[in-house]
Each structure stands twice: as C-alpha cells, then as structure tokens.
C-alpha cells in the first residue's frame, strides 16, 4: 500500500474528464501563413524608412547676442549703463582703473604731471620762437624798405645827373667850337672840360652808391628768407617734440584708465561686474542683445556622416530642453543654410550648446541653421518666447530607402570588405 510505485501511480491519476478539441484545419493554417508572408513581403518591399540622427543645438538670433570681455586687469571705478538700457555703438559702459601706486603716489598721475609740465615749457619755447621770428623779420623788412627808398632816390638822382652831364657835354663841345672861332680863350675851355669830368666822377660815385643799395636790398631779401626758414625749422623741431609728448601723454592715459565701450547697437541684457570689483583679462563684463529681434534661429551641429544628406528647405523636428517633449511635444523647423566646411574650434567655443571634441576622437562638425516655425509657444493661456542660448535637440531625416535595403545593408558591408582592388 505504501510502495513507491503505488504512490507515483496515485499522483498521476486524473481528477477530471479530458476534453479533446478538434484541431485547426490545415487550409486555415496555410491561408494564415500565406497572408502573413504576403503582408511581410509587401511591408519590406513597398515600405520605406528614413535614417535619422539626433543632433544638439541652441537657439540664437541674427545678429547674435554680444558678449563684451575685459582686455585688461584692473578695478571697475565707474558704470555708465544699467540693465535694460538701450545703447548705441561706441557708448561708454565701464571705466576700469589699471594704474599702479608707489610711495611717491600713483605712477600714471606723476608721469602725466611731468609730461604736462614739459608740454607747457615746449609751448612757451614755441611762442618765444614765433615772437623772435616776427621781430627779426620785421626788422629786416624795415631795413629792406629803407634801402629800397634809398635805391629809388639814388636812381632818380642818377637819372637827373645823367641828363645834366649830357647838357654839360653839349656845352663843352660848344666851347670847343667857340675856342676854334676865337670867341673864348683856352682857359675858359679848360675850365669847362674840367667841370664836365668832375661831374662825370660825381656820377660814378652816385652809381656806385646806387649799386651798393641794390646789393644791400638783395642781401636783406636773402636774409629774410634764411631767417624765416631757420625759425620755421626750429619751431618745427619743437612741434615734433610736442607731438611726441602728446603721444606719450595718450599712452599714459592708456596706462591709467580704460573705457570699455559698446561694440554694437542693442539693449543691455546683463551686467557681470559692479563698481569696485576687480576684473582680469578675459572676464565677461556684459551682454548686449539686439534691440529688435525679428526671428530666432536654431544652430545645429551635424556630424560629417549626416551633412551630405541635408539640403536647404528640409523639415526637422525640434525638442527644447526648456519645453519638455513629454508636455509640449515636438516642434517643426526648416533648414535655411548649411555650411560646407567644418566649424573651427574657436567658433564652436562661442556656442554653449556646441559638442566638445575629446582628445583622440575629433569629429568634424558642420553648422546648420534652421528656423523654427513657431517663434512663440503658447501654454496655459500664456505666450512663452524663445530666448538666446536655449538648448535644443533636433532629429534630422537623412537618406530614405526600402526596408529590404536596410535589411540587406550588412551584406553590402560584407561585399565591400571582400572586394579586391578597384581598377577605374
């Protein structure tokens, strides 16, 4: 009764009735298999699938928001703008003090004071030179005028003397005729001849004096030109020295205080430093956004294996990090421009959402600009605008193939790996 076989037999005994159902007909199984195989073949032959890739990016505007950095090290001593203020290109933003101090005071102030004193002395020297030039040239001009008057008077006297000598010469010739006719004696003729030659000698003396006056006029004119040129050269040398001092004064200002100016028109979005704060070279000072933003754009970074399949006008799906897809869904955008050269590292560093290349795994990235169709997102009776720098993820739709082609793609790889050298 307690044998093992009896116990096993008791366990295997059925407790109820067995109902045998009729089997599925063969023709139904065949029909179902044919329908399934036909549908599967139609699906893989007719159906298509687009390869897609997810890339990162961020929202921006054109022109972009401008970050102004400090080019010097110093202390902020004055702030000219406030957040939200509209500014124009060239407007002052910050005043930074970069001067150094010693026991004798501020170095730049002392240097500036010395240069200003030198400039005052140089200006005084130039003024005295100009005054001396005027006095010297006026004196020489007066002498020239005096000699000119003397030359004119002596010329008039010589002209009248020449006329008188001509008359005396005629009288002498008449006396010769009178003496030949016996009307006068020889002594009278001799007196007349002596008087004529005496007047001739006087004329020669007047001519010599007249020539001396003309020569003196020429000498004075030459002195006027020489003295003027000499004074001009000396004044020019002093002006050059003043110009060098002025340049040195400008350099002193550069070493004392630096004014940071706006580089573009726009609105001050944020100020990074306050008065009294120390800044180093490369520190961010403020951000300026465009005054009127017409459109927001999406900057996408696409790897090199995807960029050949993208063209302007393609649609892409966008998911904003600020607007989760679980709540807001995906948004549509249109590709506007595609760069055909890889973006440089310096350019990518200016975008916070750009991918970072790791050492040993450098990937060429191409910049693609897309325009979202919705610039403002409506949610719960509110309008939520896009903002600069918002991170986003986009799905790009690349090449489109039949499903069977995607299924056979591993065999294409095997074919390429087994192919020998190509002979073009």
UniProtKB/Swiss-Prot annotation:
Xref: Pfam families: CusB_dom_1, HlyD_3
GO biological process, one term: transmembrane transport
GO CC terms, sorted: plasma membrane
UniProt function note: Probably involved, in conjunction with MchF, in the secretion of microcin H47.
Keyword field: Bacteriocin transport, Cell inner membrane, Cell membrane, Membrane, Protein transport, Transmembrane, Transmembrane helix, Transport
Organism of derivation: Escherichia coli
InterPro entries, sorted: CusB-like_dom_1 (IPR043602), MFP (IPR050739), Secretion_HlyD_CS (IPR006144)
Name of the gene encoding the protein in the UniProt record: mchE
The organism's place on the tree of life at top rank: Bacteria
PROSITE patterns listed in its UniProt record: HLYD_FAMILY
Entry protein name: Microcin H47 secretion protein MchE
Topology, Periplasmic side: 47-424
Membrane-spanning intervals of the chain: 26-46
């Amino acid at each position: 009764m307690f044998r093992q076989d009896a116990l096993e037999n008791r366990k295997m005994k059925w407790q109820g009735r067995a109902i045998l159902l009729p089997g599925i007909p063969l023709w139904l199984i065949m029909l179902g298999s044919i329908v399934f195989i036909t549908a599967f073949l139609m699906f893989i032959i007719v159906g298509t699938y687009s390869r897609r890739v997810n890339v990162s990016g961020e929202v921006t505007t054109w022109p972009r928001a401008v970050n102004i950095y400090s080019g010097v090290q110093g202390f902020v001593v004055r702030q000219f703008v406030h957040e939200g203020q509209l500014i124009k290109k060239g407007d002052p933003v910050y005043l930074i003090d970069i001067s150094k101090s010693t026991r004798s005071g501020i170095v730049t102030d002392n240097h500036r004071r010395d240069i200003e004193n030198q400039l005052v002395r140089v200006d005084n020297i130039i003024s005295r030179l100009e005054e001396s030039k005027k006095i010297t040239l006026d004196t020489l001009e007066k002498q020239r005028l005096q000699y000119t008057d003397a030359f004119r008077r002596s010329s008039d006297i010589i002209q009248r003397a020449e006329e008188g000598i001509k008359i005396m010469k005629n009288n002498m010739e008449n006396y010769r005729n009178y003496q030949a006719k016996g009307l006068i004696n020889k002594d009278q003729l001799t007196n007349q001849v002596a008087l004529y030659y005496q007047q001739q000698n006087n004329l020669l003396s007047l001519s010599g004096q007249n020539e001396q006056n003309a020569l003196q006029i020429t000498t004075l004119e030459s002195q006027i030109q020489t003295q003027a040129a000499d004074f001009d050269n000396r004044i020019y040398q002093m002006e050059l020295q003043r110009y060098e001092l002025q340049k040195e004064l400008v350099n002193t200002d550069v070493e004392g205080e630096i004014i940071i100016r706006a580089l573009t028109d726009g609105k001050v979005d944020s100020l990074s430093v306050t008065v009294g704060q120390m800044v180093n070279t490369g520190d961010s000072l403020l951000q300026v956004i465009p005054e009127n933003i017409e459109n927001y754009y999406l900057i996408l970074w696409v790897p090199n294996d995807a960029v050949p399949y993208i063209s302007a006008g393609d649609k892409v799906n966008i998911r904003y990090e600020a607007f989760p897809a679980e709540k807001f869904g995906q948004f549509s955008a249109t590709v506007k421009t595609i760069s055909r050269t890889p973006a440089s590292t310096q350019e990518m560093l200016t975008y916070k959402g750009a991918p970072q290349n790791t050492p040993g795994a450098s990937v060429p990235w191409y910049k693609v600009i897309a325009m979202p169709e919705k610039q403002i997102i409506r949610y719960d009776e509110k309008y939520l605008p896009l903002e600069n720098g918002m991170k986003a993820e986009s799905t790009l739709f690349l090449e489109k193939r039949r499903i069977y082609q995607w299924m056979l793609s591993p065999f294409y790889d095997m074919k390429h790996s087994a192919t020998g050298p190509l002979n073009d």
